[in-house]
């Protein structure tokens, strides 16, 4: 695959980037803290939708994020004290997640997800399962709203791309995003949750030297 849209979905955000002809696209507009980086960096666009993103009703409108439950307490279904309805809770109630992960070692609390989602369902005049479906749909819309302008700036048609998904939620939401964008091929690497760390270990080092003249 030579033309790839990457999608790294974590707990707080979804980061997208683009490879054309096997080469990562770069950007000259990056900052570390408040300081501009005066050299090309990998062009990454962050979208405020992740597995821990909290659902809320704002003036009658369903919104996902940017607030996040984080890794602790995390989604309500993790049974770590979280009570806010998150996108992960929506995945569980909508049937995208099983009720146990890690070979059954990590149980997900469906009842806690239903309890957390109840205020959202009430605000939407729906049951918790319908509310969960709407949460997933809004998250997809947020992603599409971020991805399409990014690809337009690069002059790329989504239908010409393969979607590479990783991160904790990439394998769940990647196919949904691909369907919205008209992308026909989705790749999920082995161990997607640790794919970034793996890349950091095996990538070749490169050096850029710049001098002001």
Regions found by a protein language model. Name each.
Residues 1-213:
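N-terminally biased helix-coil "hinge/interface" segments that flank
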């Amino acid at each position: 695959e030579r033309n790839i849209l990457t999608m790294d979905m974590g707990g707080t955000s979804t980061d997208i980037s683009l490879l054309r002809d096997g080469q990562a696209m770069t950007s000259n507009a990056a900052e570390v803290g408040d300081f501009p980086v005066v050299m090309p960096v990998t062009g990454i666009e962050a979208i405020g939708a992740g597995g821990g993103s909290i659902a809320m009703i704002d003036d009658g409108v369903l919104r996902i994020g940017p607030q996040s439950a984080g890794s602790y307490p995390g989604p309500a279904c993790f049974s770590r004290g979280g009570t806010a309805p998150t996108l992960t809770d929506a995945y569980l109630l909508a049937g995208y997640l099983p009720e146990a992960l890690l070979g059954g070692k990590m149980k997900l609390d469906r009842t806690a997800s239903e309890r957390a989602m109840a205020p959202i369902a009430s605000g939407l005049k729906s049951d918790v399962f319908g509310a969960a479906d709407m949460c997933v749909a809004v998250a997809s819309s947020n992603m599409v709203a971020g991805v399409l302008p990014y690809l337009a700036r690069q002059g790329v048609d989504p239908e010409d791309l393969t979607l590479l998904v990783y991160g904790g939620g990439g394998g769940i939401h990647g196919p949904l995003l691909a369907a919205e964008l008209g992308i026909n091929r989705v790749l999920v690497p082995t161990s997607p949750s640790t794919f970034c760390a793996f890349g950091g270990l095996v990538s070749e080092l490169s050096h850029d030297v710049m001098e002001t003249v």
